[in-house]
Amino acid sequence: MTNDSASHTPSDNTEMTEMQRYVTQQRGTEPAFSGKLLHNKRTGAYHCLCCQAPLFYSDSKYDSGCGWPSFDQPVSSEAVRYLEDESHNMRRIEIRCGQCDAHLGHVFPDGPKTTGERYCVNSASLSFIDDVDGERVDG
């Protein structure tokens, strides 16, 4: 496993916010409870902010109380890539977009009984697309 840095920008060539760039390109973490998509309860899919690849469905999102959007599984085994992360004197598993390698967050083995996994994802790395009206909301 490696710790390479991501180097992709949004596919529609819009400018990223400072936080979106910090999270997706520099493996940063947004402050807990600050993300735009944390409390989103609409039905739809969460996509990579940088390349718009689908990552998580809304029915896999749950409130873990950790301060970041949490999911119990990605849309497919290819949707995310896993890397060992030993930064900050911790041992964690980093998750990145399986298509463009943008940093998303981390996965932990303390999730719900369905999968046992908690995909802790920065809102700033996601775009949400509503199933009903097609509205896109960038985190």
Curated annotation (Swiss-Prot):
What is the active site of this protein? C120 (nucleophile)
* Domain MsrB, residue spans: 9-131
The domain of life for this entry's organism is Bacteria
Q: Which reaction does it catalyse?
A: L-methionyl-[protein] + [thioredoxin]-disulfide + H2O = L-methionyl-(R)-S-oxide-[protein] + [thioredoxin]-dithiol
Give the matching Pfam families: SelR
Q: What class of enzyme is it?
A: oxidoreductase
Q: Which GO terms describe its biological process?
A: protein repair; response to oxidative stress
Give the enzyme's EC designation.
1.8.4.12
Query: GO terms for CC?
Result: cytoplasm
Q: Which UniProt keywords apply?
A: Metal-binding, Oxidoreductase, Zinc
- SUPFAM superfamilies registered for this protein in UniProt: Mss4-like
Q: Which PROSITE patterns match?
A: MSRB
An example of a GO molecular function for this protein is: zinc ion binding
Please name the PANTHER family in this protein's record.
METHIONINE SULFOXIDE REDUCTASE, METHIONINE-R-SULFOXIDE REDUCTASE B1
Q: What is this protein called?
A: Peptide methionine sulfoxide reductase MsrB
Q: Please give the organism.
A: Pectobacterium atrosepticum (strain SCRI 1043 / ATCC BAA-672)
